[in-house]
């Protein structure tokens, strides 16, 4: 399973505090069979400043290989966002380390 975590624009050790789709980049991890998460890449988000349904389609394409999206929050100005509720986890504006710990707890539950 692949996981994308929204990264803060100024501090790559923190989750981006705004809507998931506005994050400037994502840490892409592969979850192993025993729950370990291995960083595969840092992926830039060229659509961070875009808005609307067209952006949603572009975001789905950008993260088409990702199974679970992790961010501080999802949706913007009444929109539920580009991704189904089942495919995302809200963690709040926490450290990357805290977000990873929550994912590990979730996978062992």
Question: Which residues does each predicted region cover?
Answer:
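Non-catalytic interface/targeting segments
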Residues: 1-57, 65, 88-109
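Mid-chain, well-packed structural core segment of small domains
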Residues: 58-87
């Amino acid at each position: 399973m692949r996981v994308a975590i929204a990264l803060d624009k100024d501090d790559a050790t923190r989750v981006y505090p705004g809507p998931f789709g506005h994050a400037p980049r994502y840490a892409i991890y592969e979850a192993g069979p025993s729950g370990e998460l291995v960083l595969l890449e840092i992926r830039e988000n060229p659509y961070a400043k875009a808005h609307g349904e067209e952006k949603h389609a572009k975001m789905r394409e950008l993260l088409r290989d990702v199974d679970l999206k992790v961010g501080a929050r999802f949706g913007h100005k009444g929109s539920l966002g580009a991704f189904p509720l089942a495919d995302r986890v809200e963690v709040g504006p926490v450290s990357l380390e805290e977000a990873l710990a929550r994912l590990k707890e979730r996978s062992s539950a």
